[in-house]
């Protein structure tokens, strides 16, 4: 059996027996010494059920305690205390932001959860000088960062699609969206970090100071420390956004047009693609938010039974520059090979566009459709393999499926800092592909996980060279394969910054170490 498929088979077996995976481990005594720590915040020992859940809603690993830090010192004190307990203690620590992990990565079975959102305070500081930046807590939500920086007419350059995530959470992974082709992921847009390591040391780091820890933590899956503060560079924020969508029937034209746009000097400010399978009335659905360029022809378009490819783009502008924006957009559109009847557009404020997923969230919450299992699969595919992948996955594996959005868009490797811990293909252009399924009931979860299994199995056998984003592995062999030649560096950094493997146990990369280590002075 191929090791890269084990986690899916385990989940399939468990779900066939009845639903969400819950880990029950022998209950260790709550270390009474935790109650004796002097803190600005406090521990919770009883009301900890929320910390045993995440957005995936597929795993539940109850902690023994939740720390609600009142300061960075609280986090350092707690981690240092666990470190001093030594190798014989099984206690681990996980930082939990907004809990948007999928398979329990932000959980710590019978360990300590740090509620990072408790660290939100009035410490966010915007420096609007010549090289503007914002200092934000690792527990701050990106939407709050946006609101604060817009007061100065500024904003970060790189975003995620969903802004109700914490700064430390996305920087521990990568942080990608339609701006990534131009600015790189969020981890390529950081000036400085403050980190609490697995020894309990508070360290300020940057590309010039403690650079190894800086690059290790970015995309480091929480393995080397808890990000408690980040300094994010800013740029002037536009007031408005022209938001466009078009459709393609041909995958080759769809991908070639995207690749042309991300390589052009003058292009759109945001570019993402979507794959649409077995969706009826797609253009009619767009009418609630967008205006058709050709109302008559768009009303006659039939999407039933077709695989369609949607290209979504934006152009930023200020109201007094609307005419120039119109000319630039029309010039770019004239170079694309989309179906003319499918052009839809609308003008919205910058914040309305960036916070667009939250608007969808509110609608889904009202229907009870948000807090459901999300067996997502996020992968990165080399450009040279994207057509082979698409032919099998969209033409065969998923031809009868309709479980949720599928994102597919290219980015430029040159915009990613190869010193960070994130793993990407070794080609100048690669594709981010996300299968964002929602599942209701054990049967639907099992069906979706089975499709994920088939996608990964095909990719392995066909030599696609897939790398998982938000990776979900369970064995050291799988992680070694994921990191490849970078595994030795990742291990060495772990030994340097978290030698007892206290941090982020939910990633299932390292077991808590057993080593003879000098205690910190």
Swiss-Prot record:
Pfam families: Cytokin-bind, FAD_binding_4. The modification Pros-8alpha-FAD histidine is found at residue 100. Its cofactor is FAD. Its EC number is 1.5.99.12. Residues 1-22 form the signal peptide. Induction: Induced by the synthetic strigolactone analog GR24. Its main location: secreted. Glycans are attached at residues 57, 278, 412, 418, 472. One of its GO terms (biological process) is cytokinin metabolic process. It is an enzyme of class 1 (oxidoreductase). GO terms for cellular component: cytosol; extracellular region; nucleus. Catalyzes the oxidation of cytokinins, a family of N(6)-substituted adenine derivatives that are plant hormones, where the substituent is an isopentenyl group. Possesses cytokinin oxidase activity toward trans-zeatin (tZ) and N6-(2-isopentenyl)adenine (2iP) in vitro. Functions as a primary strigolactone-responsive gene to regulate rice tillering, plant height, and panicle size, likely via a secondary response gene, RR5, which encodes a cytokinin-inducible rice type-A response regulator that seems to act as negative regulator of the cytokinin signaling. Belongs to the oxygen-dependent FAD-linked oxidoreductase family. This is Cytokinin dehydrogenase 9. It comes from Oryza sativa subsp. japonica. The gene is CKX9.
């Amino acid at each position: 059996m191929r090791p890269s498929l084990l986690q899916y088979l385990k989940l399939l077996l468990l779900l066939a027996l009845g639903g969400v995976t819950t880990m029950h481990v022998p209950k260790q005594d709550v270390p009474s010494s935790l109650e004796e720590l002097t803190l600005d915040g406090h521990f919770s020992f009883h009301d900890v059920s929320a910390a045993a859940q995440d957005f995936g809603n597929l795993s539940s690993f109850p902690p023994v305690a939740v720390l609600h830090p009142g300061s960075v010192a609280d986090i350092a004190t707690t981690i240092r205390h666990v470190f001093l307990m030594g190798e014989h203690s099984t206690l681990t620590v996980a930082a939990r932001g907004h809990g948007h992990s999928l398979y329990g990565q932000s959980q710590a079975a019978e360990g300590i959860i740090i509620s990072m959102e408790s660290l939100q305070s009035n410490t966010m500081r915007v420096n609007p000088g010549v090289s503007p930046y914002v200092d934000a807590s690792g527990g701050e939500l990106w939407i709050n960062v946006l609101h604060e920086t817009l007061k100065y007419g500024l904003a970060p350059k790189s975003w995620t699609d969903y802004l109700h995530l914490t700064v430390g959470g996305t920087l521990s992974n990568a942080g990608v969206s339609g701006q990534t082709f131009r600015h790189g992921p969020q981890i390529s847009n950081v000036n400085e970090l403050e980190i609490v390591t697995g020894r309990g040391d508070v360290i300020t780091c940057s590309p010039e100071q403690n650079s190894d820890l800086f690059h290790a933590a970015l995309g480091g899956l929480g393995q080397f420390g808890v990000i408690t503060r980040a300094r994010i560079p800013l740029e002037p924020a536009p007031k408005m956004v022209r938001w466009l969508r078009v459709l393609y029937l041909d995958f080759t034209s769809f991908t070639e047009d995207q690749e042309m746009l991300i390589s052009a000097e003058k292009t759109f400010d945001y570019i993402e693609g979507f794959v649409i399978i077995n969706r009826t009335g797609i253009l009619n659905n767009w009418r609630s938010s967008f205006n058709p360029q050709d109302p008559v022809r768009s009303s006659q378009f039939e999407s039933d039974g077709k695989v369609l490819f949607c290209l979504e783009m934006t152009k930023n502008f200020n109201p007094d520059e609307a005419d120039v924006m119109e000319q630039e957009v029309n010039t770019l559109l004239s170079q694309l090979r989309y179906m003319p009847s499918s052009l839809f557009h609308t003008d919205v404020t910058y914040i309305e566009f960036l916070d667009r997923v939250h608007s969808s969230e509110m609608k889904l919450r009202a229907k009870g459709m948000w807090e459901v299992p999300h067996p997502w699969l996020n992968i990165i595919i080399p450009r040279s393999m994207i057509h082979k992948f698409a032919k099998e996955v969209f033409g065969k594996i998923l031809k009868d499926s309709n479980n949720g959005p599928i994102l597919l868009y290219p980015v430029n490797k040159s915009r990613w800092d190869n010193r960070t811990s994130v793993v990407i293909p070794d080609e100048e252009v690669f594709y981010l592909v996300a299968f964002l399924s929602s599942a209701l009931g054990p049967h639907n979860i099992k069906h979706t996980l089975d499709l994920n299994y088939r996608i990964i199995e095909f990719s392995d056998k066909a030599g696609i060279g897939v790398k998982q984003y938000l990776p979900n592995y369970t064995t050291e062999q799988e992680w070694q394969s994921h990191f490849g030649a970078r595994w030795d560096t990742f291990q060495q950094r772990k030994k340097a910054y978290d030698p007892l493997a206290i941090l982020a146990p939910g990633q299932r990369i390292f077991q808590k170490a057993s080593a003879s280590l000098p205690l910190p002075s």
